[in-house]
Amino acid sequence: MLQVLKLFAAMCSIGLMAEIRSKSNKKFMLLSALGIFMVVDSHTWTAFNLFISFIPYNSFFMPMFVFISGYFNKVGSDTRLGKYTLKKMKTLLLPYAGISLAVFGLQFLINWFKLGEIQPVPSGYLLYVLENVITTGTSNSMATPMWFVITLFATLMIYALMKKLLGKVWNSYVMLAVFTCLHLGVIYLVKTVGPEALIYWLLPLKVLFFLPFLEMGIIYRDHLEGLHTKLTGGVKIGIMTVLLLFNMSRTMYLPNAYDVAFDDIGELAGFTSPYIVTPLISSIVGILFWLTLVDLIGKPVQESRFVNYMSCNTFWIMGFHIAFFNILNCILMFINEHIVDVLYFDTEFFKESEWYRWELVDGFKMAYVVIGILGPLGLKWVFDKLVMTVGKLFKKKTPQPQA
């Protein structure tokens, strides 16, 4: 039993991001916590408007996660690829499998509750899931955001292989230029051909899309962070103001204001801007804005234990928040059917879709944000306690060797 729990713990943890500890880099701790907050908020159709009128979440936050990974990336020509691959499998693929399996179980129970019957598993479902994992990266609908884990793993592995082969002659600025050209080529290809025709090429194309942001994180760490940190508060406010005005001007000349964003990057869709450079510019603007804001005003919350715990468990939030949205909907449906009418709660819509949100008043979106963050974190806390308790019980029962 203990070994099963330990294995599941490994599968549902995310290396350094899942340990109960205090992160030493407080700025990037806060940045990752803000990033996962934005993921949850965007899936509630934005309960909290964090500058999204100027810088929409979907214009930068997934590239920002890759930028953060790049900041901490230390691979080089001396990296042992076998050891590195095993490490990334443990910290990325095992958590992906564990969380996806757990969400599948929750989805089964939620569907049983809201439909009133057990849904049969379709024939060939496992093959369908495996195909999705290596294309879109999604194992099931309630774990849709976990596509990012597969893409991040592939991006890190391709980058490590290139750095291993070319590390001794590697120039970050030259490689950033190369990666940028490949990134623009991906956008052009997708807009020209369409993502539907590239379904089996989605994963390598997403890797090419994200590579420049990985290199940007490394360049920032090695060459720019010191300069950026030393800027005065007035200069940082000026930078943020210029970025907001710049994005505002972009929304004025694009066909639609929201063209600065790209909604469905997991399937390389949603690139509505006529310019292939738009996603790159939008991502740089968003990353630099929030990086500067965190550097400017982040210190009061950087010591928060809750923010630290949230940052350490971003993958739990990423994987479970939609399931907890649906748990809240199940509660509302039960109240609506057995206690008192919940005004305008659309039971039929909820039965058909995991993405239904009750929106009688706009402020109720906050309830989804709260449960989407506290639910997964509470589940993680209970899980950690369970593993620790069972571990202690088994340790006590283990016979000690005689002297």
Report residues per predicted region.
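Alpha-helical transmembrane segments and their immediate juxtamembrane cytosolic regions
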Residues: M1-A403
